Amino acid sequence: EPELAKRQDIRPLRIGILNIMPLGKQYEFNLLHPLGLSPLQIEPVWIKLKTHSYKTWDLNHLNNLYITWEEANNPEPLDGIIITGAPIEHLAFEEVKYWDEFVKIVNEARNSCASTLGLCWAGFALAYLAGVDKKVFDRKLFGVFPLKSLVPGHPLMGTQDDEFICPQSRFAGLPDLEMEKAQKEGKLNLLAYGENVGYTIFESNDQKQLMHLGHPEYTVHRIISEIERDKEKGDVPPPENFDLNSSKTAWRSHRNLLFQQ
């Protein structure tokens, strides 16, 4: 809240959110809620791409709330940026229409922002730029899966439980051997692993880019909406380890701790 920030005599952290999810307006709360729980004052800055068509979006909402990367960093650069996923794992990165603009933004953010968080597809994209390409699956990895922290003393992972769960919703993964090779070569630091999902949380060696291939921000309602959407396609299995009759969010602590860092 701006008035509370003024009374606390602190400057809110300006966090850019590059939202490329379909039906982006409906998705916004998934990020706003955990960010709002931070003890720090957060000013979300919604960012749009100039080369993305936003076919499923409310364009009035997009144009009223979202600004370009250049506008978001003028006159002062952002403190950090979150880049969402997008259901485009089947495409080679260079085939994505907005790939060049995406690369420009993440390269500039690495120099101007304290940290970049890439979720799901954005995490894959950052891994690709670090030298590890995704492997596309025949079937969607969908459900809630256990992960194990690999670096308990890490500034981020040290706040997490040694084992925790997180939603996954993706058609791709990163080969274990290539990820381990990237760590040996000093390109990536591996932070969390799941037996059925592979290396899911990792970071660049300079700790300025954090990649999370899961969807810690998802609510139960978001998963249910994806189930309904997938039913129409008819080619996606039901989510694993997820009770459709329960409203419990068992990954809440992981989500909240992640977004409060």
Predicted regions and their residues:
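Amide-donor transfer/coupling interface in amidating biosynthetic enzymes
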Residues: 1-51, 66-67, 73, 77, ...
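Helical hinge/lid and interdomain linker segments adjacent to catalytic or ligand-binding clefts
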Residues: 60-69, 93
